[in-house]
């Protein structure tokens, strides 16, 4: 499944921002805009036992150019919340449910 970082209209958002995947399906986050974005999973908002650092980009690492991607595969069932660290304050947050 492919998730876009940034809307065609320049909005600071994950598109879609709320989605579900089967366990083990690769999720690819793709920068869709000229702004630097990243993907960080909230350590308090992932299933118990999941190390958020292992599935997140570093807070300092950014997808700077349109078309740059970051992929992750989630295997533990449950709900994961994530955000873009530069734009979290602007509401750039999302949620994935792993079935």
From Swiss-Prot:
Binding site for Cu cation: 37, 84, 87, 92
A Pfam family this chain is assigned to: Copper-bind
The organism's place on the tree of life at top rank: Eukaryota
GO molecular function: copper ion binding; electron transporter, transferring electrons from cytochrome b6/f complex of photosystem II activity
GO cellular component terms listed in the entry, alphabetical order: chloroplast thylakoid lumen; chloroplast thylakoid membrane
Keywords, in A-Z order: Chloroplast, Copper, Electron transport, Membrane, Metal-binding, Plastid, Thylakoid, Transport
Bilayer disposition of the protein: Peripheral membrane protein
Obligatory cofactor(s): Cu(2+)
Domain Plastocyanin-like: 1-99
Localization in the cell: Plastid, Chloroplast thylakoid membrane
Coiled-coil region(s): none
Family assignment from sequence similarity: Belongs to the plastocyanin family.
Functional summary from the UniProt entry: Participates in electron transfer between P700 and the cytochrome b6-f complex in photosystem I.
Protein name: Plastocyanin
Origin species: Sambucus nigra
Name of the gene encoding the protein in the UniProt record: PETE
């Amino acid at each position: 499944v492919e998730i876009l970082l940034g809307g065609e209209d320049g909005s600071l958002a994950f598109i879609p921002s709320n989605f579900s995947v089967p366990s083990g399906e690769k999720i690819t986050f793709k920068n869709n805009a000229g702004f630097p974005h990243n993907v960080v999973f909230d350590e308090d908002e992932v299933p118990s036992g999941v190390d958020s650092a292992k599935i997140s980009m570093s807070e300092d690492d950014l997808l700077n150019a349109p078309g740059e991607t970051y992929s992750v595969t989630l295997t533990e069932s449950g709900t994961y919340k994530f955000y873009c660290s530069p734009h979290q304050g602007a509401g750039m947050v999302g949620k994935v449910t792993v079935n």
